């Protein structure tokens, strides 16, 4: 359900609500083996129930000539949220293994260095916001767009501890230039340090990432 209203000639607002149910995936139910990409030995749970969530959001859009912007705020209240939770005591002792740990003649466990993790579920709440504003202007025979955006998400379980593997807040600075069939884009992501970590996790450091892209569109139909 979504309701919208114009607040002025340049600003409109919309309010949305959604009730969503998600069944556990096959992996979440029956996984029982290594996931080498994440360095984990994952165990599913056939007793998992469906996730249900009530999602609320409010969005403001602004457009006035060359200038534009939007801001969106949301709260998602999730019952029986499914997540992969590391076994706490399994983070210790994975480094420093050597051959002396194994009796003579006993084969190595190929999964001994993987962190054991289980699919579990618990009530959780997510909240956050996304904002972006920018300006599009004529430059030479094309259009130049400059923008800034930021997104933030917070997630906690009902007992107060943090949901694991949540993306840190980030700022995104973007520049794009379009002229005829050529588009050049440049963006710099300034990602914050993540201190709101789940059980068994370690903080991730802040970092910056610069992306560039140049594209040209060709008409293969032969029509002018």
Per-region residue spans from a language model:
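Residue-level signature of outer-membrane beta-barrel architecture
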Residues: 3-6, 19, 50, 60-64, ...
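Transmembrane beta-barrel outer-membrane domains
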Residues: 39, 49-53, 122-126, 162-168, ...
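Surface-exposed extracellular loop regions of Gram-negative outer-membrane beta-barrel proteins
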Residues: 5, 9-55, 75-113, 189-199
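Outer-membrane beta-barrel transmembrane strands
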Residues: 6, 49-68, 122-127
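Membrane-spanning beta-strand positions in outer-membrane beta-barrel proteins
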Residues: 2, 12-16, 57, 68-70, ...
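Short coil turns and loop connectors of transmembrane beta-barrels in diderm outer membranes
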Residues: 9-10, 54, 65-66, 139-142, ...
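Hydrophobic, lipid-facing positions within transmembrane beta-strands of outer-membrane proteins
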Residues: 1, 13, 44-46, 54-58, ...
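Gram-negative outer-membrane beta-barrel transporters
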Residues: 66, 73-78, 91-195
């Amino acid at each position: 359900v979504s309701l919208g209203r114009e607040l002025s000639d340049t600003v409109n607002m919309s309010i949305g609500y959604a009730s969503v149910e998600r069944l556990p995936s096959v992996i979440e139910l029956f996984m029982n083996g290594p996931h080498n990409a994440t360095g984990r030995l994952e165990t599913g749970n056939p007793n998992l129930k469906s996730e249900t969530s009530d999602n609320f959001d409010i969005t403001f859009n602004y457009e006035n000539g060359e200038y534009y912007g939007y801001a969106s705020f949301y709260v998602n209240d999730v019952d029986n949220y499914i997540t992969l939770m590391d076994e706490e005591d399994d983070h210790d002792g994975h480094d420093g293994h050597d051959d002396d740990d194994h009796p003579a003649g006993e084969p190595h466990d190929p999964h001994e260095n993987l962190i054991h993790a289980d699919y579990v579920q618990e009530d959780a709440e997510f909240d956050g916001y996304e904002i972006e504003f920018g300006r599009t202007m004529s430059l030479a025979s094309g259009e130049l767009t400059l923008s800034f955006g930021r997104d933030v998400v917070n997630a906690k379980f009902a007992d107060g501890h943090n949901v694991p593997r949540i993306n840190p807040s980030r700022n995104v600075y973007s520049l794009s230039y379009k002229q005829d069939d050529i588009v050049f884009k440049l963006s710099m992501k300034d990602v914050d340090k993540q201190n709101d970590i789940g059980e068994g996790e370690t903080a991730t450091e802040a970092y910056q990432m610069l992306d560039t892209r140049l594209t040209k569109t060709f008409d293969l139909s032969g029509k002018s």
